[in-house]
Regions:
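Domain-scale recognition of functional cores that engage charged ligands
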Residues: 277-282, 308-314, 319
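Conserved class I S-adenosyl-L-methionine
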Residues: 299-310
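Glycine- and other small-residue-rich loops at beta-strand/loop junctions that grip anionic moieties
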Residues: 273, 307, 389
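Intrinsically disordered, low-complexity glycine/charged-rich regulatory or linker segments
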Residues: 1-296, 472, 477-515
């Protein structure tokens, strides 16, 4: 059933009776639905926790108060390590759990309040918009045993009340109304339901404001779409925030964006789109910083290496944030002139070609190997514990868990283009999970995960919140067995061998052709 709601004009009789005098909730749209109260409440809770579904201006919602006995406040996110940045991101990071976030009282005739929450809406850009606290109320009304046909429906209601006393106090991303109510009515005998959306206006004349009416229609359409999707058996395939909580990642990302984004975009030296690459690398940096905070709490950071580092921006950001490390790529980039740092006499960005010791050497009839410039070769052996970063490293992606096993190093790999261990373009076999798409990217991700597992790694997967469709990150930080028990030669043979890699590496040491 396509979404085609019935518009209800200003003269429509209210469906809801607020017990407070003078508070009139005007219905705007109504639509039939095929899902019951449980689905309605589940969808609404998801929308409360994830307001970014309704508005791209929003990051998330932090739950500050909840009458559910099972709820407990989340720990406050870590504060900035940079005092000069604390003021700029205070609006995002200032979650004071010792404060009392009192909900706005509301009650409706014939309804009982089942659950009351207070959420803080966190905008993407705190320079443009302020966070907003909002009371969210779940209420319900069940038919009595002797109810007539008109009153035989189960009614479920979710109400949003912004903590603002006047329209000008509301940020851009929130409709300028005193309250929003979404009502679900369910006729169990006929298995038919209806949805409707209602506004509590600051001024009843606001019913004529087209933007408010358009927003109401959009909110109802999202609720309808998600509810109907549950009926059709939709299950969420992508799960974010498995490794790092959403609030921590987004707070760190907001901090980095405020600190670096404008300068990086305005002074972009490459021909590629800065709006994509800058925010993508800021997101990856934010994830790594929070990951490392967990992994190395109370320990000295062991350093990182970014293999196939490309333009070097990720290395630059991490160094600026105080992490020791370096990166290399087969081809230097224009950006390196700005991003490179010299520490202890060594460049942070180096032109090197990866040639692992495990790569088979070709045999020639005359007994000679292709000439190598050894000064431009790295054998893939790193100091034990060095964190290996492999971000869209293409030919180096399948080598990442192998090098990590040999060096005793944890890693992150974010695959992009599919290549085999010989460095050639390659279509990996279909994923083991037959419910997943057999796309080239899904095949690559599963194939790389298989290699990692065969190298003895427990593979953790996180769908990064970055502006890229190639956003699957795989982590290796725990092992199923010691590296000595892994037969690397057997792994290489199982996944097609390394034929052609040596010759390609030899050419790269003599040319500027990159990955």
């Amino acid at each position: 059933m396509a979404f085609d709601p019935t518009a209800l004009g200003p003269s429509a009789e209210p469906y809801l009776r607020d017990v407070s005098p003078g508070r009139i909730w005007h219905p705007l749209f109504r639509h039939e639905c095929a899902f019951g109260p449980d689905v309605f409440e589940d969808v609404m809770m998801n929308l409360i926790k994830n307001p970014n579904i309704n508005s791209s201006w929003l990051f998330r919602a932090d739950i500050l108060h909840d009458t559910d006995p099972a709820w407990s406040p989340s720990p406050p996110p870590p504060t900035s390590d940079h005092p000069d940045q604390q003021g700029a991101v205070a609006a995002v990071q200032d979650v004071r759990h010792e404060e009392q976030h009192q909900p706005i009282p509301v009650a409706f005739q014939d309804f009982r309040n089942d659950r009351v929450l207070v959420r803080r809406l966190i905008p993407r850009n705190t320079r443009r918009d302020d966070p907003l606290e909002q009371t969210c109320v779940f209420a319900s009304s069940s038919p009595g045993k002797d109810a007539d046909a008109a009153a035989s429906k189960t009614r479920s209601l979710v109400v949003y009340l912004p903590h603002a006393s006047e329209p000008d106090a509301l940020p851009f991303y929130h409709p300028k109304v005193r309250g929003v109510a979404q009502l679900h009515e369910w006729d169990a005998a006929r298995a038919v339901g209806t949805l409707s959306i209602h506004y509590l206006f600051f001024d009843d004349a606001d019913f004529a404001v087209e933007k408010l009416v358009r927003t109401a229609r959009m909110l109802l359409s999202v609720l309808y779409k998600h509810g109907q999707g549950r009926v059709r058996g939709y299950t969420k395939r992508v799960h974010h925030d498995v490794v790092i909580p959403q609030a921590r990642f987004q707070n760190r990302y907001a901090e980095l964006k405020l600190k670096y984004a404008r300068d990086l975009v305005e002074n972009w030296a490459e021909t590629t789109d800065p709006s994509k690459h800058v925010f993508e690398d800021l997101g990856i940096a934010a994830f790594l910083i929070e990951l490392w905070a967990d992994m190395y709490r109370g320990q000295e950071f062991p350093g990182f290496v970014d293999i196939g580092c490309g333009n070097g921006l990720l290395v630059y950001i991490l160094l600026e944030e105080g992490y020791s490390g370096w990166g290399f790529d087969a081809r230097a980039r224009k950006s390196w002139a700005k991003y490179n740092k010299v520490r202890d006499g060594k460049d942070s960005l180096q032109r090197l070609v990866l040639l692992p010791d495990a790569v088979s050497r070709p045999s020639h009839e005359d007994g000679r190997e292709p000439a190598l410039d050894l000064s431009q070769i790295h054998n893939g052996a790193f100091p034990k514990g060095t964190f290996i970063v492999s971000n869209h490293a293409d030919e180096l992606t399948p080598w990442t868990p192998i090098l990590a096993a040999q060096s005793g190093s944890p890693f992150i790999m974010i695959p992009c283009c599919s290549h085999n261990l010989g460095g050639h373009k390659y279509r990996a076999p279909p994923p083991r999970d037959k419910t997943k798409s057999p796309s080239t990217y899904s095949c690559l991700v599963d194939w790389a995960a298989r290699i990692a597992e065969d190298c003895g790694w427990v593979v953790e997967t996180e769908m990064l919140r970055i502006p890229s469709t190639r956003n699957t990150a795989m982590l290796g930080r725990r092992r199923t067995r010691d590296a000595e028990e892994v037969g690397i030669d057997g792994v290489l043979a199982k996944y097609g061998g390394t034929g052609g890699y040596f010759e390609s590496a030899a050419k790269l040491t003599r040319t500027e052709k990159g990955h």
